Amino acid sequence: MTEYETYKETAISSFRLAVELFNRPYENGREEGVLILLDHSFEMLLKAAILRRGGEIRADDGSGQTVSLETCVKRCRDGTRDNQRMQCLSKSEAAAIFSLNNLRDYAQHEQVDVREQQLYLQSRQCSDIFEAILTRVFNESLSQYLPERVLPLSTTVPTDIAT
């Protein structure tokens, strides 16, 4: 397995866990877990995308550490002077990932209180962006990694599908 495939598999595993936690029937740790795992899934997926497109994810300081999510988003939004092929995010998709990362910061370091509709909309948007990156960079679909039986259930109908 190549390095980018390893990062992609980790991304998909984190995304699956986020879906599982989102659909959890009780609240303990649910909001925090969903945000943390979605954020992690994007960091790993963007690192996989950068590697797949011939970029570098190790810091220039010789430490061997990988670059931050923020750096990954910027590279995938703008490319680099030496490699424009890394571009795989629109400005609005990048903004959505930055928004997720800010919510994740609160979930990780503070107390987060995300309303159910906000968590749903953030998670739905993340699903769409994750799918788009898989398609653009890897020519794959999220449906290849999630069983058809996955169905978000709730006691309230999300506003984007209400009739």
What are these regions (language model features)?
Residues 12, 31-52, 124-127:
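Short, hydrophobic, well-ordered secondary-structure elements
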Residues 88-143:
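Charge-enriched, short contiguous segments at helix-coil
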Residues 18-36:
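An N-terminal domain-cap segment
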Residues 8-19, 101-105:
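Active-site-adjacent bridging/hinge elements
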Residues 29-32, 53-64, 144-149:
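Short, glycine/acidic-rich hinge or "gate" loops at secondary-structure transitions
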Residues 131-163:
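Polyanionic, low-complexity intrinsically disordered segments
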Residues 19-23, 78-85, 104-110:
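Short, charged/polar, low-complexity loop and linker segments
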Residues 50-92:
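Flexible secondary-structure boundary motifs
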